[in-house]
A protein has these predicted regions:
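Radical SAM enzyme [4Fe-4S]-AdoMet core and its adjacent flexible, acidic
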Residues: 6-7, 18, 33-34, 38-53, ...
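Conserved alpha-helical substructure of the radical SAM core
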Residues: 1-119, 133-134, 138-141, 153, ...
């Protein structure tokens, strides 16, 4: 393959962007909590909010960007509204967030900047009453309202639902609620199950475990 052909192929791929080093929820299986504390502290300290100039370069080169943190949540980037304003309306972007800690006014501005080229994926694992069992400190009922607000602003909304033991009984209800509210329900069978007491308590029944090396994702109401 010639170099120019290689570059064009890479350009078509979606690259994941860990836009910040901040998150306000305390998910027990997150890298922030399962990694050596000194190592993760160094990683957080040595990182920060992605520079706008870097965002511009990524937008220029790639056809798609996926804002999804491994140690952060993109909406906590101090200038995330400016990040949204830099995105190319002729390309595609996805913002993955737990959704907590932002005002209605902030979301109205974010959705105004998003348009049809930005998909918002809200990590709500179960219905609002069960999601904070794993996503500790998540304001789940407020997140639910922001998901509905996004729909009212013609934003494409994905309800990203990681299946745990405490929410697998709500899946059928979630499918119906997604239809009613025009959400795309994305059921995620996770592979992140270390052999420890916390993970074993959260682990769902066998039918909801991924059989692959990566997470299994099934979408409804596309």
């Amino acid at each position: 393959m010639r170099y120019n052909e290689y570059v064009n192929e890479v350009r078509k791929k979606s690259v994941n962007v860990d836009a910040s080093n901040k998150c306000i929820v305390q998910c027990p299986l997150c890298e922030r909590h399962i990694t050596d504390k000194k190592l993760i502290a160094q990683k957080i300290k040595s990182s920060g909010d992605i520079q706008i100039s870097t965002v511009d370069k990524l937008v220029k080169f790639f056809d798609s960007l996926n804002f999804c943190g491994t140690i952060s949540d993109p909406i906590y980037h101090k200038n995330f509204l400016e990040v949204l304003s830099r995105l190319d309306i002729n390309k595609f972007y996805r913002v993955n967030t737990n959704g907590s800690g932002k005002t209605v006014d902030w979301y109205l501005k974010a959705f105004e900047l998003s348009g049809k080229h930005v998909e918002w994926a809200f990590s709500l694992d179960g219905l609002p009453d069960t999601s904070p069992i794993y996503r500790i400190n998540q304001k789940s009922y407020e997140v639910w309202e922001m998901m509905k607000l996004a729909i009212s602003k013609n934003i494409r909304v994905v309800w990203k639902y990681v299946i745990f033991s405490h929410n697998e009984h709500q899946i059928d209800e979630a499918i119906e609620l997604a239809k009613k509210n025009k959400f795309i329900l994305e059921l995620v069978k996770s592979t992140r199950w270390p052999d420890d007491e916390v993970a074993n308590k959260l682990k769902p029944s066998e039918k909801w475990l991924s059989k692959n090396t990566d997470n299994d994702r099934t979408q409804y109401n596309i």
